């Protein structure tokens, strides 16, 4: 840090949740002097809700974050207590790893990582006010009279609760649920960013005063119970993966030894003997179900439920409803599954997945004790709802920046999303593009066909966000191209160009790409005939005999055939497991992959049609009023973005294209005349 100006940075990141940590780390890796500010350094990267990372779509995001040099996957690999591959019986597009992390250990390892990152400073402070960059006045002064003296022209300034002023050339806000947050359990309401932590009320009011339209959103969390009061004999056990599984690509492509777990002691004694897998100790999770008595207790107390009494004003996530909402909406369903998830190796706290609630605490005790395995359960923390401010739709651009103010970036729940993974992905891109802004370089914008991160951000800027947004595989129309197994092939080359990963890792990924392509060429070129000798060799490894001539690739297309079987039968080259996986997927799904790739090429032509930033959509003749208003509000940067806006039909797109072509011809004519 500059010793003459100790409080002046290239970039300031406000908030050290999952978005803020990734943003600060990325910018610092890219050479920017970065300051990460948080209300409580002991809660940095705190997992304030569930202890899980990953799952369908979310696991895809984590693999992409890792491929781009982010931290979430690496930290999870060192701190998980269990990991599984979900949707293993389905196709590769929807398979994804999901881990249960040790919540306190995750935060500890993340903090240690950030503390040792060059160019990055961590400070504990609550930000109460933001000063926007001011150009030099006519008399050379940089700031209005009521602002602190010494703020440099073109710099942001943030003022802390202790009146300390920090300055920077760009600013990233990752405020989570803290903006004017309030927590609710029954009739109890108190100001909080999350339980036990003060809200950022002054900052929320300051953003509103700066003219940012804000909406009120809501999320919830379930009770935490004491493992010592659970009858585990009446639960169904869910074990972790029996074979090595990680989020990180690094150990596969570099041949590194997988990361050592950060915890090496014994688990809390309340848990039954954990699975001692040969590759990594893991703790099981446990499944229980609600009962008719549970449902009756909830229904009997709906008049005390803030969700139905009008106390809660914010809109909650549709796909993560509270238990009282599920019982009302799905009245015909006799039971709901609840997963009991340990929050760490050395704690007795257990997270009740699927039981988000803001019912009064006495009701929470009663309903949980109606479940046989929980007859004597004791709550360690009651569930609660949290309401908070978020930006209204249309405030951010594709590079995560404000549409109003250059150099201001937003990431995480302030943009209307929910989930650790969604926040981390946005934070990574906000940090990258804030650094690019500081360096005077164009932004990095991932397309929908390049990454789930691209789908996420594109949805945020082209769709009306009326409730907290959660990522699903169904949101990605090119999901067969965006698998967890090829995230490094899609994104690590870009990460190397940005300085987020070292050359050794990029070269290793390129070797993986080249080896996969080479093996596919070998398979396509090797012709097999249905001779007795060939069929005998195939039969020896469990492959059905041939009835006609075909290539080795054709044999591998059979659903039940694996590359290792074929290698043994045909003396094919040996390869690493991840390369074999790539070869199998390319062989089995080649036709579908080619079809999706053709569709991508068609859509890319629409994305290539740029819309000038100053384009006046209100002046478009022949456009419906609804379309005109939608385009003017969202201000899409490309024809492709415009086509994805709700309420925009093909006729509207055709009118827009004609208008752009007309403007292009006019601008070209003006250039010719001015040149003459």
From Swiss-Prot:
Main subcellular location: cytoplasm
A Gene Ontology BP annotation from the UniProt entry: tRNA wobble uridine modification
Keywords for this protein: Cytoplasm, FAD, Flavoprotein, NAD, tRNA processing
Annotated NAD(+) binding sites: 316-330
GO molecular function: flavin adenine dinucleotide binding
GO cellular component: cytosol
Cofactor: FAD
Pfam families: GIDA, GIDA_C_1st, SAM_GIDA_C
Disulphides: none
Gene3D superfamilies to which the protein is assigned, alphabetical: FAD/NAD(P)-binding domain, GidA associated domain, C-terminal subdomain, tRNA uridine 5-carboxymethylaminomethyl modification enzyme MnmG/GidA
Binding-site list for FAD: 15-20
InterPro entries: FAD/NAD-bd_sf, GIDA_C_N, MnmG, MnmG-rel, MnmG-rel_CS, MnmG_C, MnmG_C_subdom, MnmG_C_subdom_sf
Subcellular location(s) of the protein: Cytoplasm
Family according to the record: Belongs to the MnmG family.
Known role: NAD-binding protein involved in the addition of a carboxymethylaminomethyl (cmnm) group at the wobble position (U34) of certain tRNAs, forming tRNA-cmnm(5)s(2)U34.
Subunit note: Homodimer. Heterotetramer of two MnmE and two MnmG subunits.
Name of the protein in question: tRNA uridine 5-carboxymethylaminomethyl modification enzyme MnmG
Organism of provenance: Roseiflexus castenholzii (strain DSM 13941 / HLO8)
Lineage: Bacteria, Bacillati, Chloroflexota, Chloroflexia, Chloroflexales
Protein encoded by which gene: mnmG
């Amino acid at each position: 840090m500059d010793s003459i100006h100790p409080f002046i940075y290239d970039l300031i990141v406000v908030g050290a949740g999952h978005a803020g940590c990734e943003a600060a780390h990325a910018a610092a890796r890219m050479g920017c002097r970065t300051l990460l500010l948080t209300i409580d350094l002991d809660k940095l990267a705190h997992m304030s809700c569930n202890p899980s990372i990953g799952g369908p779509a979310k696991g895809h995001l984590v693999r992409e974050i890792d491929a781009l040099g982010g931290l979430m996957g690496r930290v999870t690999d060192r701190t998980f207590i269990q990991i599984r591959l979900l949707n293993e019986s389905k196709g590769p597009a929807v398979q994804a790893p999901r881990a249960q992390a040790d919540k306190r250990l995750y935060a500890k390892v993340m903090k240690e990582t950030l503390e040792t990152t060059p160019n990055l400073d961590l400070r504990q402070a609550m930000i109460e006010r933001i000063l926007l960059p001011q150009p030099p006045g006519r008399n050379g002064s940089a700031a209005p009279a009521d602002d602190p003296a010494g703020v440099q022209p073109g710099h942001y300034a943030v003022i802390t609760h202790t009146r300390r002023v920090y300055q920077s050339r760009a600013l990233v806000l990752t405020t989570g649920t803290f903006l004017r947050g309030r927590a609710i359990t029954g009739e109890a309401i108190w100001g909080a960013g999350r339980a036990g932590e003060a809200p950022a009320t002054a900052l929320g009011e300051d953003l509103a005063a700066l003219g940012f339209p804000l909406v009120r959103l809501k999320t919830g969390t379930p009770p935490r119970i004491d493992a010592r009061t659970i009858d585990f004999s009446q639960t169904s056990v869910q074990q972790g993966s029996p074979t090595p599984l990680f989020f990180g690509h690094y150990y596969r492509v570099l041949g590194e030894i997988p990361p050592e777990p950060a915890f090496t002691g014994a688990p809390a004694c309340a848990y039954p003997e954990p699975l001692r897998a040969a590759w990594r100790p893991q703790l099981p999770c446990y499944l229980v179900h609600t009962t008719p008595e549970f449902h009756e207790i909830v229904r009997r107390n709906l008049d005390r439920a803030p969700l139905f009494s009008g106390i809660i004003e914010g809109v909650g996530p549709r796909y993560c409803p509270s238990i009282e909402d599920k019982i009302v909406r799905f009245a015909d369903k006799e039971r709901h599954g609840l997963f009991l998830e340990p929050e760490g190796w050395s704690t007795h706290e257990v997270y009740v997945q699927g039981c988000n609630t803001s019912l009064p605490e006495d009701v929470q005790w009663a309903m949980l004790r109606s479940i046989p395995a929980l007859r004597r359960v004791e709550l360690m923390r009651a569930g609660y709802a949290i309401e908070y401010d978020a930006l209204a739709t249309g405030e951010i651009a594709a590079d995560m920046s404000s549409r109003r103010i250059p150099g201001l970036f937003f990431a995480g729940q302030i943009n209307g999303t929910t989930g650790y993974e969604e926040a981390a992905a946005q934070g990574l891109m906000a940090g990258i593009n804030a650094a690019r802004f500081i360096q005077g370089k164009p932004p990095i914008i991932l397309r929908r066909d390049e990454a789930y991160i691209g789908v996420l951000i594109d949805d945020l800027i082209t769709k009306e966000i009326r409730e907290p947004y959660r990522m699903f595989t169904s949101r990605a129309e090119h999901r067969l191209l965006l698998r967890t197994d090829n995230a490094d092939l899609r994104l690590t080359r870009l990460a190397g160009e940005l300085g987020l990963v070292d050359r050794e890792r990029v070269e290793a990924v390129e070797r993986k790409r080249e080896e996969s392509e080479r093996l596919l060429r070998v398979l396509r070129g090797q012709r097999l005939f249905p001779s007795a000798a060939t069929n005998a060799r195939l039969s020896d490894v469990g492959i059905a005999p041939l009835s006609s001539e075909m290539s080795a690739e054709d044999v591998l297309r059979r659903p039940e055939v694996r590359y290792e079987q074929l290698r043994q039968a045909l003396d094919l080259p040996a390869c690493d497991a991840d390369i074999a996986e790539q070869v199998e997927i390319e062989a089995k799904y080649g036709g579908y992959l080619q079809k999706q790739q053709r569709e991508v090429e068609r859509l890319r032509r629409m994305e290539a049609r740029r819309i000038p930033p100053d384009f006046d959509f209100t002046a478009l003749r022949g456009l419906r009023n609804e379309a005109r208003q939608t385009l003017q509000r969202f201000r899409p940067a490309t024809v492709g973005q415009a086509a994805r806006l709700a309420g925009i039909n093909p006729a509207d797109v055709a009118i827009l294209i004609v208008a752009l072509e007309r403007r292009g011809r006019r601008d070209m004519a003006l250039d010719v005349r001015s040149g003459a």
